[in-house]
Amino acid sequence: MVREEVAGSTQTLQWKCVESRVDSKRLYYGRFILSPLRKGQADTVGIALRRALLGEIEGTCITRAKFGSVPHEYSTIAGIEESVQEILLNLKEIVLRSNLYGVRDASICVKGPRYITAQDIILPPSVEIVDTAQPIANLTEPIDFCIDLQIKRDRGYQTELRKNYQDGSYPIDAVSMPVRNVNYSIFSCGNGNEKHEILFLEIWTNGSLTPKEALYEASRNLIDLFLPFLHAEEEGTSFEENKNRFTPPLFTFQKRLTNLKKNKKGIPLNCIFIDQLELTSRTYNCLKRANIHTLLDLLSKTEEDLMRIDSFRMEDRKHIWDTLEKHLPIDLLKNKLSF
């Protein structure tokens, strides 16, 4: 972290992207600015965002590979230049982009002699490869080579104990960290009592999402983390009665719509987050797991889409409908919702 004195002016708190570039298919860079901040606030925001970006962003990667009857990961397979361990390490480096949840199956099935790259992986429709040229193995002889793969979306670094799997299935230490590095610097501006701080935030990603997308997701995760503190505890209500209850923010969905109507503006559905809906914790968590963050995301889903969400029930569907019906114009619901 670097501190410098620079000239600046006091204005409403705002952020913007001051630099964005693509260094390669697996290296994106973005530089953002947030200002003006009071003294000490830049450190608070910078530390929180850096931790959230490095540890809370979800990524998709290959977590398991099955070769068939292979006694151990240091084995070699006739007609293949690389050992099983080297192939596993190459699979670990494959960068995937998806919105899937749970475990999905993929496979590789080719005939040599030829080079195997990430382009040869047969993936589910919801998954795509960031860099199709990433190497996997080199077949030096005319052999049939097949691998069954498992793909999972998670966060952080996951390890599994190594065993001699009789069926030839081997775990891959999953690195579900789309953000490769984060750095922030703080610049001071102004004089005397008018001194403010400017926060510069640099983000590098692996190409599975852009730095702007990573910043958005990290910010949403931090907001979700602090939501319980935004609502004052109801007087006379015991902890036991509230411990399983989702607490909405102070600025509720209803209040947001009322303000918009007073200002005679259209309703920006992509700016209303599901955090502001009066949803139960169960329904809210189901939607978040399905990457439904805004009202626009929700209204773009059909009933079939919602019912395919893990743990989503008919009661959740009815609860969502009742909430929207209470606050949204009925013609908007008919146009947007198919259930």
UniProtKB/Swiss-Prot annotation:
EC number in record: 2.7.7.6
Reactions listed under catalytic activity: RNA(n) + a ribonucleoside 5'-triphosphate = RNA(n+1) + diphosphate
InterPro entries: DNA-dir_RNA_pol_insert, DNA-dir_RNA_pol_RpoA/D/Rpb3, DNA-dir_RpoA, RBP11-like, RNAP_asu_C, RNApol_insert_sf
Main location: plastid
Enzyme class: transferase
Chain intervals for the UniProt region annotation (Alpha N-terminal domain (alpha-NTD)): 1-233
Pfam families found in the cross-reference section: RNA_pol_A_bac, RNA_pol_A_CTD, RNA_pol_L
Residue ranges of the region described as Alpha C-terminal domain (alpha-CTD): 266-339
Any one Gene Ontology BP term: DNA-templated transcription
GO MF term list: DNA binding; DNA-directed RNA polymerase activity; protein dimerization activity
Annotated Gene3D superfamilies: 5' to 3' exonuclease, C-terminal subdomain, DNA-directed RNA polymerase, insert domain, RNA polymerase, RBP11-like subunit
Keyword Transferase: yes
Gene Ontology CC annotations of this record: chloroplast; DNA-directed RNA polymerase complex; mitochondrion
HAMAP family named among the record's database cross-references: RNApol_bact_RpoA
Family of the protein in this entry: Belongs to the RNA polymerase alpha chain family.
Identification of the protein by name: DNA-directed RNA polymerase subunit alpha
Taxonomy of the source species: Eukaryota, Viridiplantae, Streptophyta, Embryophyta, Tracheophyta
